């Protein structure tokens, strides 16, 4: 039990404003650097089948946003890399840790992707460390993201193995039920876990899960994240791959977790669930709104770029964000 560590989540934190130094919020720079590339926003749509597909990945890359393609179309990954490179776009894919993934990684030497994410639920594992070392040996120029983890020890071990960034978050997402099924996780204290892990990190941290509002992006950065992976806020768009369902004349999109039986195709070791989200507008509009809100956050922080968010003070007031209201 960690009695000496502050425990809080996104809804418990309010950031304290500083004097604004820009004339217009549009002057605020929301760009972020990851590896050798600069992206428009520090956000990543979750690498889940109901969030991203090849069409969305291509559009995000073309428009200057970072993405991670999911790993559930295994045979399609190599052709995907080739198509992205033919269009002079970055290729960012996911892999697991099963034996056949080693041969797959080795097969990419002639056309290596710029980014590979090792994507398993419990990333503090010998199998992940072994895969990191294999990727770095076979594809030394590829930026490796490893996860998911929830402790400083895990971050240090994965970094020492060669990971270029670590993904922090065990079960805080809206369609993840890890904490219910296993008793383990960062659900309910995800932001504190990000802070805890970031203090130990020498390389970028990606906060993954638990994001419910655009303001949570700024809070993630304040507590040490370089990038923020988001599921539910990116689900349910017109372009989203999730199946469309109509109920009483209203349209919904399916959104399910990567460890759900809908993803796995069987009821075994299930740690995810499926929900229906009212269909939103276009993904591009959500990205624009996220950028505008983050620019406002930077203006409140008294700065010109994301770095200013890391220096603001904050208060912990449990469950205070809505103050009895909702949006």
UniProtKB/Swiss-Prot annotation:
Enzyme class name: oxidoreductase
SMART domains referenced in this protein's UniProt entry, alphabetically: IMPDH
Biological process terms in GO annotation: purine nucleotide metabolic process
Known catalytic reactions: IMP + NH4(+) + NADP(+) = GMP + NADPH + 2 H(+)
EC number: 1.7.1.7
UniProt: NADP(+) binding residues: 205-228
Residues forming the catalytic site: 176 (thioimidate intermediate)
Protein's name in the database: GMP reductase
Organism name: Streptococcus equi subsp. equi (strain 4047)
